[in-house]
C-alpha cells in the first residue's frame, strides 16, 4: 500500500473514532448510578444521567449525601456522561 493510501486509511479511522457515539463502556461508572436525592430536605434542581434513555434528566437533590451521578447543570452532565 502506498504512503498516500496509508494516510487516507489513517484519516478515515480517525474520523470514524471521532464520529462514533460513546458506548456505555466508555462512560464513567458514576453515570450508571440511579438518581439519589439524599436524606436532606433542601430542594436543589439538579441533573443525573439516565443510561436507559441515554440522556441527562432533571431531578431534585436534597442537598446532602446522595451519589456522584448529580450535576449542577445539564451541560456538565452531558460532558461527563453523554459526550
Curated annotation (Swiss-Prot):
GO molecular function: serine-type endopeptidase inhibitor activity
Protein name: Kunitz-type serine protease inhibitor textilinin-2
Main location group: secreted
Highest taxon above the source species: Eukaryota
Organism whose genome encodes this protein: Pseudonaja textilis textilis (Eastern brown snake)
Keywords: Disulfide bond, Protease inhibitor, Secreted, Serine protease inhibitor, Signal
Task performed by this protein: Serine protease inhibitor that inhibits plasmin (Ki=2.2 nM). In vivo, reduces blood loss in a mouse tail vein bleeding model.
Residues carrying the site annotation Reactive bond for trypsin: 41-42
UniProt record similarity statement: Belongs to the venom Kunitz-type family.
Amino acid at each position: 500500500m502506498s504512503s498516500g493510501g496509508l494516510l487516507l486509511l489513517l484519516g478515515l479511522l480517525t474520523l470514524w473514532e471521532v464520529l462514533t457515539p460513546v458506548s456505555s463502556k466508555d462512560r464513567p461508572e458514576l453515570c450508571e448510578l440511579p438518581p439519589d436525592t439524599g436524606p436532606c430536605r433542601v430542594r436543589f434542581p439538579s441533573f443525573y444521567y439516565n443510561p436507559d434513555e441515554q440522556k441527562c434528566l432533571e431531578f431534585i437533590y436534597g442537598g446532602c449525601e446522595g451519589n456522584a451521578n448529580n450535576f449542577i447543570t445539564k451541560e456538565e452532565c452531558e460532558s461527563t456522561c453523554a459526550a
